[in-house]
Amino acid sequence: MTKKQAIKRKVKEPEPTNEQSSASEPSDNEEDDDLLQAVKDPGEDTTDDEGIDQEYQSDSSEDLEFESDEEGNYLGRKANNEAEGDAEEDEDDDEEEDEDSDEASEDNDDAEEEKPSSSMTAAVQTKVEPIIQIIPRDPSKPEYEDSDTSDEEDIRNTVGNIPMHWYDEYKHIGYDWDAKKIVKPPKGDQIDDFLRKIEDPNFWRTVKDPQTGQEVLLTDEDIALIKRVNSGRIPNAEHDEYAPWIEWFTSEVEKMPIKNVPDHKRSFLPSVSEKKKVSRMVHALKMGWMKTTEEVEREKQKKRGPKFYMLWETDTGRESMRRIHDPVSAPKRDLPGHAESYNPPPEYLFDEKETKEWLKQKDEPHKRKLHFMPQKFKSLREVPAYSRYLRERFLRCLDLYLCPRAKRVKLNIDAEYLIPKLPSPRDLQPFPTVESLVYRGHTDLVRSVSVEPKGEYMASGSDDKTVKIWEIATGRCIRTIETNDVVRCVAWCPNAKLSIIAVATGSRLLLINPKVGDKLLIKKTDDLLAASPSLDVIDNERIKTAVQWSNAEPEEQEKGVRVVITHFKPIRQVTWHGRGDYLATVMPEGANRSALIHQLSKRRSQIPFSKSKGLIQCVLFHPVKPCFFVATQHNIRIYDLVKQELIKKLLTNSKWISGMSIHPKGDNLLVSTYDKKMLWFDLDLSTKPYQTMRLHRNAVRSVAFHLRYPLFASGSDDQAVIVSHGMVYNDLLQNPLIVPLKKLQTHEKRDEFGVLDVSWHPVQPWVFSTGADCTIRLYT
């Protein structure tokens, strides 16, 4: 039997008492006794001086064998010689260890309880490695019960960490692991909560789970944990916060040298190599080969030269430095022209009109085209001395030494670069391009035209004192209504439920039922206009003297005239409100009563302004807001009819305003002037024109926006109707797009008049124009 088998059997057998062990198992030889002293008793403490359990194992997977030398010291070495012989024995030993592992563990525990005495040192013992016992996990308990991980939480609601108030409007509160809705539990009212407070003894420890909405009963451990947290103590009651401190690592810094080798004896003797080096340097100094530091500095100073320097780079540039840098020569005077000759051609001499204009600008000489008046002499000897010679020489000297001179780089900018890039007109269709119909029947100037809201009929007014109703599709004149004066303006009511035409003729405003279209609509209009006015409204004297309401005479009733509103001055313009109940008239000669607002349903009139801010040309209602636009000769004022105050004043910078039209959205205004301009105002942007368009050669008399398409048209005395694209975007950061599309010029000019009015079809992209040639033209 080998030594290892004997040691293992010693471990397996129960350990006897001290007396029995010493008597029954005497040591066989001295080697076994020394082996017991070398091997540490497994019953002793296996911790090091720091308190950490130490597990003694072999240096490698092979076994260690202990031998003793002559002095009794035991050495461990690998059993290389007996590796083959012990291989079979090791296999048997492993089988025996597996069978008797339980008995060995019990014997090991007994050995720890009873330490061997001195008599037991003779017994052969062996070092037994500690056996690690794996305790199986209880499946009924969570794997991470005592840890902080959240992977094993009992999560019923799988919505995640989101605000649960997102589910307040739903009947469910989330989804379970089967993707089914978790229905909210029924909620009680305040009475149920009050009864639970009284009857339920566990009400105070019941909380609501926000994930599932269920009520959870807190255990005693939960309540104790909450109390400890509220009191500021450690949540775990088993934790000892005053446990003795174990200093696993020392806090004392031990300063020890890296090497502690004593100095050599030759380190105390002077260096021989340094002695030779110094002797060579002394010899070089004596021979002049080596220079001292002072000599080196003196040589460097000689190489640097003197410290003073020249004020200028070169002697030749001294004079140029004294002068002005880059002098600019004085501009030369303009050479005399033909007008300054003593005998100029006749076309350069002033006539009486030019002479008066030149003398009129005496106080503003800078506005004169020439600073002198050309004169003609027969011969050079007749030319007198120049009277302005000294003054011009003096002004020239002032310009030379008082006016600063500078060189300006001339920018060569291509003209095409300044022109904005506009889309092609082909991409902006549809818009009218050709003349389709010509409506003939009037015998004098056709001043105004208006289209029915449905787009089937059209009304026109002329200087021949007639109003004509036209069928648009066929060009046939359905009815002609004669008036007693020149028709300045006609306006069809924009309300499609009424069939009314407002005609301004002289100082009378006629409300006419044209009797075209639906018969029920015609009857409804007659019933509305035949209703007697209310008597509870009392007009003041100022209104009574300005306007009077009356029913039409029987002769006019047959023509279709229903109501006559008589004004105290000639009417120039009439316009409707978008709902068709209010209409406004303009009398330029009416001073502070130039503009009047009439209400059709109550048959009453109002004077909105008590003072005249200028000669009113035209008025306009806002399509959406309760605002009123009033255009004078130079400016446009916007009033709030509800608050009765001025909102904004638009500056046109023009001589005379002829008309205006507002965009259907109400944010942009188009103004026409007699000085050949069209002004586009962005009401949200500024009080000054956003864009000024000079498309016509003569006065622009009328402008109009289309109700549906991004189109607007203008008519001028140059017999042209110009159709343009005007897109207004909902994005406030994007400017309107204005593109001229087509110039339609088919009217004839008579008495310096051309196109007098333009109007759009309410549905189709068609435009109507009236002219001085007594015609109405349709462009499609």
Curated annotation (Swiss-Prot):
GO terms for molecular function: ribonucleoprotein complex binding. InterPro entries: BOP1/Erb1, BOP1_N_dom, WD40/YVTN_repeat-like_dom_sf, WD40_repeat_CS, WD40_repeat_dom_sf, WD40_rpt. It comes from the Eukaryota. Residues 44-53, 60-72, 83-113, 145-154 have a biased composition (Acidic residues). WD repeats lie at residues 441-482, 484-522, 566-608, 611-649, 652-691, 695-734, 750-780. Residues 1-11 have a biased composition (Basic residues). Keywords: Nucleus, Repeat, Ribosome biogenesis, rRNA processing, WD repeat. It is found in: Nucleus, Nucleolus; Nucleus, Nucleoplasm. Coiled coil: none annotated. Its main location: nucleus. Residues 1-155 are annotated as: Disordered. GO terms for biological process: maturation of 5.8S rRNA from tricistronic rRNA transcript (SSU-rRNA, 5.8S rRNA, LSU-rRNA); maturation of LSU-rRNA from tricistronic rRNA transcript (SSU-rRNA, 5.8S rRNA, LSU-rRNA); regulation of hemocyte proliferation. GO terms for cellular component: nucleoplasm; PeBoW complex; preribosome, large subunit precursor. It holds the Pfam family WD40. Residues 17-26 have a biased composition (Polar residues). Required for maturation of ribosomal RNAs and formation of the large ribosomal subunit. Belongs to the WD repeat BOP1/ERB1 family. This is Ribosome biogenesis protein BOP1 homolog. It comes from Drosophila virilis (Fruit fly).
